[in-house]
Regions:
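Chalcogenol-based redox active-site neighborhoods
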Residues: 1-196
């Protein structure tokens, strides 16, 4: 089954390092970054989980939970925790084994919103570690664009200018953005990032 943007993320029940979970219940009303990794006790995966653990306060600040999955048994995950803590300087959290598949050979990532909709998908080759700072940036963009009539340009970062969506007529844009905007083209109106 291929998951597409806008699909409801499938629910599942599975044993994890923190006990048995049902995915939708575990996610609650949070944003979720769900990612697969090829195998426990491998170098790239170890650095990725260390990076996730170090960034946990940033994910928490965005009301986002992170969950990793692989085909390895939960017992292996528990043994691997020590290596990650030792080599990455942070503890593993929310590492589970949700599927019994034996073919996970790539690094897939799904960002799922509080309504359980898939909002972003990325697939990396096994030899390329993920950029979790980019996933934080994507969450920032999704949360901002969900609550305002804006889009974020290439390489946008929190606090930088945004683009007013083309579907918003100028009259409504004047109400939503009283500080105004710069029109580079009729379809490209740049304004300050709205603050909630």
């Amino acid at each position: 089954m291929t998951l597409r943007l806008g699909d409801i993320a499938p629910d599942f029940e599975q044993d994890s390092t923190e006990g048995r979970i049902r995915f939708h219940d575990w996610a609650g009303d949070n944003w979720v970054v769900l990612f697969s990794h090829p195998k426990d006790f491998t170098p790239v995966c170890t650095t990725e989980l260390g990076a996730v653990a170090k960034l946990k306060p940033e994910f928490d600040r965005r009301n986002a939970k992170v969950i990793g999955l692989s085909v390895d048994p939960v017992e292996d995950h528990r043994r691997w925790v020590g290596d990650i803590a030792e080599t990455q300087g942070a503890a593993l959290y929310d590492m589970i084994h949700p599927n019994a598949s034996d073919t996970l050979t790539v690094r897939s990532v799904f960002i799922i919103d509080p309504k359980k909709k898939v909002r972003l998908t990325l697939t990396y080759p096994a030899a390329t570690g993920r950029n979790f700072e980019e996933l934080l940036r994507a969450i920032d963009s999704l949360q901002l664009t969900d609550s305002h009539s804006v889009a974020t340009p290439a390489n946008w970062k929190q606090g930088e200018d945004v683009i007013i969506v083309p579907s918003l007529p100028d009259e409504q844009a004047r109400e939503k953005f009283p500080q105004g905007w710069t029109a580079l083209k009729p379809y490209l109106r740049v304004t300050k990032q709205p603050n909630d």
